[in-house]
Amino acid sequence: MHVTAQTLPWMDPSLPPEQRASLLIAAMTLDQKVQQLHGASGGPPEIPACGTNNIRQVPAIASLKIPTFRITNGPVGIGGGDCNPQDPATALPIALALAASFDPALAFSFGSVIGNEALTLGLHELEGPGMNMAREGRGGRNFEYMGEDPILAGTMSSAEIPGIQQYGIIAMSKHFILNDQEVNRMSANVVVDDRTFHELYALPFEMTVKDGKVASIMCSYNRVNGPFACDNPYTLTTMLRGQWGFTGYVQSDFGATHSTAVSLNAGQDFEMQSGTNYSLARITAALADGSLTMATIDRALSRRYVQMFKFGIFDRPITRGQIDAVANGQIARSIAEQTAVLLKNQGDLLPLNAASIHSIALIGQSTYAAAAASGGGGSSRVVPLYTITPLQGLQNVLTSLGSTATVSLLTVPTNPTAANLAAVTAAAAGADVAIVMAGVVTSEGSDRPSLALPNNQDAIITAAIAANNPRTVLVLKDGDAVLMPWVDQVPAILEAWNPGEEDGNVVARLLFGLVNPSGKLPVTYPKLASDTPTSLVERYPGVTIGGVPTITYSERLQMGYRWYDAQGIAPLFPFGYGLSYTKFAYGPVQVTPATTDGTTPVTVQFTVQNVGTRAGADVPQIYVGFNPLIGEPPKRLVTWKKVTLNPGEQQLVTLTIDPKASSHPISTWDSPSQQWVPARGKLSVYLARSAGEIASTAFATVVFPSSGVPGDVNGDSVVNCADLSAVTLALGTRTGQAGFLPTADIDHNGVIDVRDASAVARTLPAGTRCS
């Protein structure tokens, strides 16, 4: 077909995206198709100022009106893109901080800032949000992710994605999948059982597909139970498209493509960055030997083009505008203020009373006390449009309060001498208030060597404590949990995370009570490194098996707070924990109906009252615990609500546990049948302040309905391995006991025994094999 400017039917915006993609692909030569299967170095010709030494783009094909496809990181704002030097953008708080807000509406605002700025800068694809689990606290990229709980991560990310995509920007859930550490991230084989895989690590991705409607997925570097993630037909096709119904496209991480035909056939659609495996020579060879078909190439192109047409990328010009730094900076500040977690407040030291303060000593290393902790490093690093330092923030707030207090900054070197530490003690002793700032800024490419604060910061904190100043406040600016050997000696601790460009204003407004802290920990803070679930070398950093670095998730479902619960280990600060400048009282939790078939919603109600003297927000959390025979950890978070109340105000909170939700709140993954199955038997519903503090408990019972089909225990009208699994787990139970399933009592004698299991086994379809 000879294409001219008059014969470009795919440029008709009234046509459906699928039809436009089909028309375009039909007009392309093989050379053009291959050029569009991978990224390339260069610069967007539409924006000459971006230069030519850039990597995140697919070059335009002017004759076909295919625009330059412009890609940018990342999970914490506009990171590295296809402009050199990198475009400055709003430095939001890190993603882990966002998770600490437990507020999906805030996640939407977070995504809206990113989407708005991506559109303003003429970009098309945003490589984020980051969906990996904070399984290992030393993980260098945990700052890009949403914590250790899959439902929290999935809920927050699913709220962020529409914020991004409303601006015609393609969001991308990454890194799919099990890319949970930086050590050997490009080569490791991650070994995990199927149930753990689905219930913990795949679940947040599933939620972003079903709830967030994410348009693209990035497959990761590592191997997944053998095959590389970008070569894996089970994850990329069976699970992602078959089980979840994903219709977008899959892009590789940079250099994560390890094959040509294998990856395309498995379900990868687009290679980043250079096209080593999707080169014309290799594609041609694969077509020639029959390992690859033109239909598969066209499928890969269509998946991306459909999204590009859907998001208007073919129909809008590429221009670079001016970001509204003031408006977006105010949003960034508001978000950061709602993410900080008050860990300790002995004697109600906080908020500080400006009227009683004449001098403040601001102490710490430059990264935390002299500069704004605007975020982590690596490809997601944001170049901030501006920053507010801690000193500037304190001065701004003191001025707004009419205070004339002085703030003296003492910057401590990374290798402090005895004289440096003596100066810390003297400064803390000589001021009305000592504010010590410490923390961790992590980066892609390496994990932390330990959970301890780096660069001798423990010594600085200890030196400040030695001053015996009762008004000593520690502000932590972390990218994950840290060890706190001095915790008992510090009166007040505020976890501010890496709060972004507005660091100084955020922290000062929190310390002086202009904002009441309301964040809750999205990760568990251990007392000791040996308490963590990954203290065994096979679990982290892994061992070499057959010449391949191998990480074994042998803790199985006991990840994060589930580990501490199951092992009976008391953490320093539990998941979901966070104090306030006010107090909240919870009424008893009530659950209706008391019996459910595992498909109908369960309603949870309770009251929350602000019994303090300040307005504030709290996050009551609902966890559920299952019949112990099912083999789950003691409890899992299923839902929550952020509640804002004035002093004395009370609110009736109603939450729904919907078994049909994409989070599968009361189901477990049944590997033999490859499906989610409602957890049968007694269901404990916990109203909690954190994973470590249950306020009230109620109960429900999940009973499968009878379908009338012989051997159908779970009531889905089909007899399969899930039914045999259900009756096996209920063996030994009697009528009236927790875990008894009437539908599993095949002989109706009031006890579930081997005769019932045998009866179910006999009704299985011929040839069925169950593990």
Could you say what each language-model-derived stretch is?
Residues 1, 588, 599, 605-608, ...:
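Low-complexity, intrinsically disordered short peptide segments enriched in small/polar/basic residues
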Residues 1-2, 539-543, 597, 734-742, ...:
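Surface-exposed charge patches in extracellular/virion surface proteins
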Residues 108, 164, 208, 359, ...:
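Residue-level detection of beta-strand scaffold positions
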Residues 688-709:
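Long, low-complexity ectodomains and other extracytoplasmic segments of secretory-pathway proteins
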